[in-house]
Amino acid sequence: MAETKEQTDDVETLMASLDQLGMEADPTSKEFNNDDSKIGAPSEVQDEKELLEFLDQLENDEEKNEKNPIEEANEENESVAATSNERQQHDASNQPSQAAQTTINKNTESATPKTVNEINKSQEFQEHVETPKQSNWLGGFWSTASAAVRSAEQRVRSIKGFEENANWDINVRNMVDLNKLGDLSNGIRSKALPTLSNTIHNVLNVVAPPIHDHEVLQVTVFHDLAGFAHLDRIVYESFEKVMFQVEGGELTVLLDKEAKVRPRTNDVYEDFGLCNGYLEAKKLAKANLAEPITEAKKMNKENKQENVGAGDDEDASESPMVRVTHLLLVIQAFTIKNKEVSDDEQLCFLIHLNDTNHNLEFSTTSQPLPLEWQRWAVDPRYIKLFGSNAILPNEWVTEWVEQSISVAAGIVAQMYTSKRMALGDPSLFAGLPEEDVNTGSSETPVPYYDGAMYA
């Protein structure tokens, strides 16, 4: 009887524990069936247990439909903890059998991993729900960052373009000499523009030509100076400055065909063809121009005959006649000794101009230069002393010689132009009222100073 009573108590204890573990255990699992088969309870107890499990399963299905996975997992954890506490208290008071204790432990162990798995699934479900929100936030942040990067790249490209333009501008300024550009612009302004304006002016004057406006001044330069190859250009620039004072007319400067540029030697007298004194230089200049003057006068006669024969054609066509005036200019070097200025010998240049068309002659002299400079210019010892890269005397001596000739040629050009304009002639003021005429105008005019230096 005692054994039967103990078995009955064990069965009641088992039924109480099954009521509490019904929500956790799976009624269809093989482990639960295997544990029950190991206990060896009667068939009635087995039927009652199956009925209770069926009822518990229905309750679990209803609760799962109403609760979320997180709450269900929390309740299962609480139920597992409560069941374990009650079982420990019951085992301590009643001391259940080894078989019942083994069954409870197995059921608890089988239920606990399942509860942990459900908790993990619930966490995965929550992460899956939160993932779209995070992905949307990350997508918006990424698009904003991409737009900022693109705008920054465009700004960098624009700044880089400005830097490249600045560098290009610096490189161009380094490659091109601005001083040379300034000289070029001045040359265009002083040479090309006047020539162009004169050309346009001549074209317009074909319709209504002014008097004495269609005239070409053809200057031929003669000299015997060694080492000076640009004297024709110097004479042209000097005459051009003076020609700006006169409306109309054209200017051409030619170099004598027989004039040859000779290299300089150590003999200064030979290099410059020096003669002694102004009078000897003037005689030599006129002698050198004797033959060219004869040829020029011959050409003038031929041109006059052609102009007379073409008079009728001119009236028919009403086209102006272009006159060519031949000017012969000779440059002659000579030496002087002026004790009032210096005891050393001085170098001067005589500039003599002859107009064969109007029978006009003008002469002047240049600024005296120390003749010793010319000896320095041809002395090779200065090259050995200072080196070829230094500024040697021949460079600045040549520059001073060209400047002195340029000034003298300009003075001769101004004298010639003033004479052609009848400046200083009393008849020029004949048409003015008497009150505007100077009282000294009736006097004889002062003769021109020819620029000669007399010893």
Curated annotation (Swiss-Prot):
Record-given protein name: Maintenance of telomere capping protein 1
Protein transport in keyword set: no
Keyword terms: Cytoplasm
Function: Involved in telomere capping.
Compositionally biased residues, Polar residues: 80-113
Annotated segments matching region Disordered: 1-113, 296-317
Matches recorded under Pfam families: DUF5427
UniProt record similarity statement: Belongs to the MTC1 family.
GO cellular component: Golgi apparatus
InterPro entries hit by this protein: DUF5427 (IPR018814)
Basic and acidic residues bias spans: 27-38, 296-305
Species the sequence originates in: Schizosaccharomyces pombe (strain 972 / ATCC 24843) (Fission yeast)
Subcellular location as annotated: Cytoplasm
